[in-house]
Amino acid sequence: MYNHNLIEKKWAKIWNDQKIYSFQIDKNKPKYYILDMFPYPSGKGLHVGHVKAYMATDVISRWKNALGFNVLHPIGWDAFGLPAEQYAIQTNNHPAKFTQENINNFRTQLKRLGFNYDYRLEVDTTNKNYFKWTQWIFKKLYEHDLAYQADIEVNWCEQLGTVLANEEVLTDENGNKISERGSYPVIKKKMRQWVLKITAFADQLIDDLENLNWPNSIKAMQVNWINKSVGASIKFEIDQLDNQTIEVFSSRADTLFGASFLALSFDHPLVKQKLITDKNNAIEQFIKDNSIDQRVRYQGINTNYFAIHPITKKKIPIYLADYILSDYGTGAVMGVPAHDERDYQFAKQYDLEIIPVIKADQYPYLLDGEHINSEFNNGLNNEQAIQKTIAYLREHNLGDQKINYKLRDWIFSRQRYWGEPFPVLFDEEDNIYLLKDSELPVELPQLSDFSPNKDGLPPLANADDQWLHPIIDQKKYRREINTMPQWAGSCWYYLAYLLKLTDLNQADGDQNYLALNSEKAKELFDHFMPVDLYVGGQEHAVLHLLYARFWYKFLHHIKIVSSTEPFSQLINQGMILGEDNTKMSKSKGNIINPDDLVLSHGADTIRTYVMFMGPLNASLAWNSNALNGTRKFLERVYNLFDRVEINDSINQNLNYDYHNFLKKINKHLENFEFNLVVSEMMIFINACYKQTQVNKEMITNFLIVLSFFAPYLAEELNSKLNNPTLLYKMRLAQWDEAYLVKNTTTISCSINGKFKLVHEFDLDSDEQEVANYFLNQDLIKRNLENKKLVKTIFVKNKVINFIIK
């Protein structure tokens, strides 16, 4: 009887005692670096939806190992961030304490499921030896002018008590801005922040996507997020203000002749410098009323100032408008209502002139066409008119071609406690000083209260004076009291695993790292990077995946790494939904706990079922009946050993099935078609059940494949074969094409074109042999009774058709 609990407990101990998953560098083998997006260790533990990606990488890593690769497949913990801190505040516990408890629980769960991780390589972003190097990278960014402080308008979430990056803000169905985490209201607020100049790498971040084997949807999301626009910078003089101009960016310079107004964002420099200082109370009140509400209503106010059209010299009104973004372009837009939907809505609202400059039947018209009302552009198409307009602007010093990006520099400060401290000091004049490498890491001080301040003052402001105001060389300094965002540690963790490869004697969970900037580290990076396969959710497309690429490109720039991209291939797994076909959540009560299933069905059943559910990238509902069906398949494999004799003799009847099995599973694994691999295992086992004896080598190689999915059961059956080597140490045999050339063919028999029978014949059997066989079958005989056979139609190796009357 297949007792999964006894089998899994037995082999877990043997594997642990023999340390079969302990990684060793072997440069005589090709390397294969495969990685999961490391998890945040929440207090809830893992549910089956979390582990789908881990199961996929486990299967691939075992397969690559069986093919002779030197496979690196580590795991770690992304443990800083808001969730831990929120939980700490709610329970009045320190986040460090329960974070470690959660990590221990996650590790135990992963071990139960039989993953082949070497836990000596485990990384923890909250460990001081780890974030020392996060701080070191920040220092290098600052030294290369890629980190700076600025007073900028930020996304402020009062409930979370922190600033959020643009990538962390969503828009709800009512047009309100909300936080990605918790769906709390987000408003705009001006604060002094640390910012990383990700825009310096914008072109590389777009151009290098072409070389990556990533889903096209993820590439498109990153391209659209960066949103490179080639357009024109155009200068408009202000009628009432001498020597003052408003610069606008437009990707449609060809529509300049259709500009009938200018629209400014609420915090455009001229709003602060001139319009507000004119003591226009209506404008002040308008800004106050509309700054809180983030929704676009196409509301505006006339400033009573006019701009002078750079070509026609016509005066056009200047408005403030709620649809103008301060952080895109210049914060000023030339309104062309006839050829822009937003400008059209605004112009209709305020009865502004609509000037068509492209011939069309209906406006607003946004496509290509013949230009009209445009002086030297009349008769030209869009591209021709754009180039001619830019040339005119350049010649008359009124503007020039310009490249613009939607991507903003990354706001890198968080007003929270549970994050990496900045390696920065300020003197009494607010001059910035970086700590020396020897002074890293900067550790978090112990606080009794780390609740966020709703006014934006970070919890670290409550630290003791010794931490907050260190004295160095008899000079008093002030520490930075913001912390880094939760994304910081995950920007480089794929390198951190490699920094542990030179100290493989450390125990599970120890955190000793080689220096990131050492020659030995460079040697390891050159050998193992980039990651060959990265698996994780598509929700990280413009967050972690973009940030990690940015940091890696910077590390390439300063010659820490040689390659330009961290992840060669990316796969996004789909979700496992609850049995009610909705996303698993505690509130819905549809979470499937793997710990319960390990006890009731076994880890092997869970692993095999999850991989058998369907395509990896599909989101599919959990089905308990299908889980039970997978369990029955594993029982069928187990029982085979009592049904057939397994020996060293060659069973010619299985040659085709065996070699076809090996060929197909390799093809399916190359394409990450795990469900089809399980199907092929079922087909091969069915073929084995038709035999009285099966070759031991064939069964051993089947067990190697089974071990990718059900390692415990496979190892138990391998021991029954008395094989001296554990499956994880074996190599998978290659198929032989010679056995895949079939010497037989299936021929169907029809009567008057209606199908009756099929039978297997030797290849190229002649008509007489085939006809004699079918004419002697009872079914055919009955159909021919009292009938006359008038004709036989025979197509060699395919079909025979008897025509009767």
UniProtKB/Swiss-Prot annotation:
Localization, UniProt: Cytoplasm
Residue positions of motif 'KMSKS' region: 583-587
CDD domains recorded: LeuRS_core
Motif 'HIGH' region location, chain numbering: 39-50
GO biological process: leucyl-tRNA aminoacylation
EC class (word): ligase
Reaction(s) catalysed (UniProt annotation): tRNA(Leu) + L-leucine + ATP = L-leucyl-tRNA(Leu) + AMP + diphosphate
PROSITE patterns, sorted: AA_TRNA_LIGASE_I
Alphabetical list of InterPro entries matching this protein: aa-tRNA-synth_I_CS (IPR001412), aa-tRNA-synth_Ia (IPR002300), Leu-tRNA-ligase (IPR002302), Leu_tRNA-synth_edit (IPR025709), M/V/L/I-tRNA-synth_anticd-bd (IPR013155), Methionyl/Leucyl_tRNA_Synth (IPR015413), Rossmann-like_a/b/a_fold (IPR014729), tRNAsynth_Ia_anticodon-bd (IPR009080)
Major localisation: cytoplasm
Keywords annotated in UniProt: Aminoacyl-tRNA synthetase, ATP-binding, Cytoplasm, Ligase, Nucleotide-binding, Protein biosynthesis
Gene Ontology MF: a single term: aminoacyl-tRNA deacylase activity
Binding site for ATP: 586
Family: Belongs to the class-I aminoacyl-tRNA synthetase family.
Name used for this protein in its record: Leucine--tRNA ligase
Species the sequence originates in: Mycoplasmoides gallisepticum (strain R(low / passage 15 / clone 2)) (Mycoplasma gallisepticum)
